[in-house]
Amino acid sequence: TKYYGNGVYCNSKKCWVDWGQAAGGIGQTVVXGWLGGAIPGK
């Protein structure tokens, strides 16, 4: 698993967001926006 910052993690199969950490990077809403569409249940 690799951590990309702003709560974003990726492994060989998928990427996901830790929203607790993502909330600390509120200035990076563009990143969270395009990742958010690919994350079920968020």
UniProtKB/Swiss-Prot annotation:
InterPro entries: Bacteriocin_IIa, Bacteriocin_IIa_CS, Bacteriocin_IIa_dom_sf. Its main location: secreted. The keyword Nuclease does not apply. GO terms for biological process: defense response to bacterium; killing of cells of another organism. It is found in: Secreted. It holds the Pfam family Bacteriocin_II. One of its GO terms (cellular component) is extracellular region. It comes from the Bacteria. Disulfide bonds join 10-15. Belongs to the bacteriocin class IIA/YGNGV family. This is Bacteriocin bavaricin-MN.
